[in-house]
């Protein structure tokens, strides 16, 4: 069975039909507004194969989010530097993803652990249409080093299988989106395991889907490569969603094409 290539198809679509736009970084982009990709999580783990993706950074970043952390020191100690450009001299990023996921502040001074609440709801009421986690806290965006790009996700259960849909307001297609697809696919597997469910789909919905002008050459090279079969995820059993370690996440048979370097737009 041929490997599904929704990500590569989106790259090609934006390259061919994207609208030239200016952007906050001053780099310039080709952009398309509104697109959806679907990945069957039973057909392999959706880690892009047309270039090598740094899986260590993906796994540690997700564990960092689940810790409720917003300081890059924990990542740096594990050799992950993907957030360094936005951090303060002390490593702080403000109330970014992990803080909102685990400790959303309420007007009464309490804090909501959205991940725990989502998992509890999966167990109590799997048919709920309210199982949503949001990082887009309007009142705290000015304090964030970078407003959330992957802002909002929803869980859905059908036939004993858990699916997740992410809304990503701003999608750096070459550098960022391969990370985001794999990260939320991994989170879906973790949540499903904790709720006693199988996995269904990961659905990615993008707002401003863009290729930076200084990534066009790299994207063209990537699209010249034939996609390979997706790898397999093996997740060790854990008692809590917050107990997972890097060693618990094993990605087998990942045989991608070589990595392609590109500058980050800050």
Curated annotation (Swiss-Prot):
Q: What is its EC number?
A: 2.1.1.45
Instruction: Indicate which residues the UniProt annotation says bind dUMP.
Output: 24, 129-130, 169-172, 180, 210-212
Listed under GO biological process in this entry are: dTMP biosynthetic process; dTTP biosynthetic process; methylation
Q: Which PROSITE patterns match?
A: THYMIDYLATE_SYNTHASE
Q: Name one GO molecular function term.
A: thymidylate synthase activity
The reply to whether Protein transport figures as a keyword in the UniProt entry is: no
Where does it localize?
A: Cytoplasm
Going by the record, the broad EC class of this enzyme is transferase
Q: Describe the reaction catalysed, as an equation.
A: dUMP + (6R)-5,10-methylene-5,6,7,8-tetrahydrofolate = 7,8-dihydrofolate + dTMP
Q: Which residues form the active site?
A: 149 (nucleophile)
Determine if Transferase is one of this entry's keywords: yes
Q: Which GO terms describe its cellular component?
A: cytosol
Tell me which Pfam families the record gives: Thymidylat_synt
Q: What does this protein do?
A: Catalyzes the reductive methylation of 2'-deoxyuridine-5'-monophosphate (dUMP) to 2'-deoxythymidine-5'-monophosphate (dTMP) while utilizing 5,10-methylenetetrahydrofolate (mTHF) as the methyl donor and reductant in the reaction, yielding dihydrofolate (DHF) as a by-product. This enzymatic reaction provides an intracellular de novo source of dTMP, an essential precursor for DNA biosynthesis.
**Which family does this protein fall into?**
Belongs to the thymidylate synthase family. Bacterial-type ThyA subfamily.
Supply the name of the protein.
Thymidylate synthase
Q: Which organism is it from?
A: Mycolicibacterium gilvum (strain PYR-GCK) (Mycobacterium gilvum (strain PYR-GCK))
| Source lineage | Bacteria, Bacillati, Actinomycetota, Actinomycetes, Mycobacteriales
